[in-house]
Amino acid sequence: DVTNRHDLLDNLKNNKADLVIMGEPPKNIPLISQASMKNPLIAIAHPENELLKKEKVTIKDLKKETLLTREVGSGTRITVERFTGLNFNSDIQINSNEAIVEAVQAGLGIGFVSMHSVNLQLKNKIIKQLDVEPFPIVRQWHIVHHAEAELSPIARRFKQFVINNTRVKKYL
């Protein structure tokens, strides 16, 4: 199930999921977490966006654009706000990365997503990565389970598979 941070945490707290893959795990829930690979967050734009013509794009430039961001409480949104100082209250909130990418493709604004979620679109030049400090913001993906939950043999094997096959060097 692909969902937002709030729902992932609810699933962990209430033992609705054996394992989750997420960004930064919270400290207020007893969890066992292992970082599995880097997760670079990038700024993306429509290929004809004027910012792509600038030699140096700044956060000040981004403030003049329509910003497409995840909902309040999203790990991506929290990270982007923390690292950039951007305030998204007056911009467009979208509840999925796929919808953000589609909105960027339609020329509706600048989006912030995991590079892993847009490799194909970048390769096909459907969207472009904006070169703006402090992006890419490199976080980690974590594989997480509740500390008090006993993992089934299948869940243990899957966890080990993820850890063994998502080495940081392979994906950045």
What is the predicted function of each stretch?
Residues 1-29, 94:
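Central regulatory/effector-binding core of bacterial HTH transcription factors
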Residues 12-13, 62, 80, 102-109, ...:
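Hydrophobic residues within well-ordered alpha-helices
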Residues 30-67:
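Flexible hinge/capping segments at coil-to-helix
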Residues 32-42, 124-138:
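Short beta-strand->loop
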Residues 48-58, 74, 148-154:
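Short helix-loop capping/hinge motifs at secondary-structure junctions, enriched
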Residues 65-86, 151-159, 168-172:
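Secondary-structure junction motif
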